[in-house]
A protein has these predicted regions:
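Conformational coupling and interaction surfaces
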Residues: 44-48, 63-167
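Active-site histidine-anchored catalytic micro-motif
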Residues: 2-75
Length: 167
């Protein structure tokens, strides 16, 4: 979600913020947005919070839209969970099925697993290749407010975050 709570912590209790050793965020995008043409929803919802987090050198790992859109789940994969048997497998199959249903009702064959992809990257960072980047938060643009501008060339700006590159 938006980084509002983390930004509030940084401003109110910088002593505690300094104890954060891994901040994995499902948000932002190196390309087009999903809420506006430029902005991913979680970045758009509170771009000032993202700017605060970036300005305070927290160890940010951004799991962005482009990465999440590669992590797809199809109806048959959700049903395969059910074959494992048991209440937990049935619950997960039902949850995944409902989530996938959002995509299929919109004519898509599969659903991108946005938040689950970020959760997996946090719990098992060995499953994801992260690369260092420089991120700037667009705060002023009329059409670009909320855009995370991702720079992969270190000679243009210092790297201040990492972005999920491959799973």
């Amino acid at each position: 979600g938006p980084l509002t709570n983390i930004a509030a912590l940084v401003l109110a209790r910088p002593d505690l913020a300094g104890r954060i050793d891994d901040l994995t965020w499902m948000g932002g995008g190196a390309g087009t947005g999903n809420h506006t043409a430029s902005a991913e929803f979680n970045a758009w919802a509170d771009p000032e919070a993202v700017a605060i987090v970036l300005a305070h050198d927290l160890p940010l790992r951004m799991v962005d839209l482009e990465f999440c859109r590669k992590i797809l789940c199809r109806p048959e994969e959700a049903e395969r969970l059910r074959t494992l048997g048991g209440a937990h497998a049935d619950l997960m199959a039902d949850l995944f099925g409902g989530f996938i249903g959002i995509a299929t009702r919109r004519g898509r064959p599969a659903m991108a697993f946005y938040d689950p992809a970020a959760a997996a990257a946090f719990v098992h960072p060995d499953l994801v290749t992260f690369e260092p980047v420089g991120i700037t938060m667009e705060l002023a643009g009329t059409a670009t407010r909320g855009r995370t501008v991702v720079e992969r060339r270190s000679h243009y700006m210092p790297f201040n975050a990492e972005i999920a590159a491959e799973a």
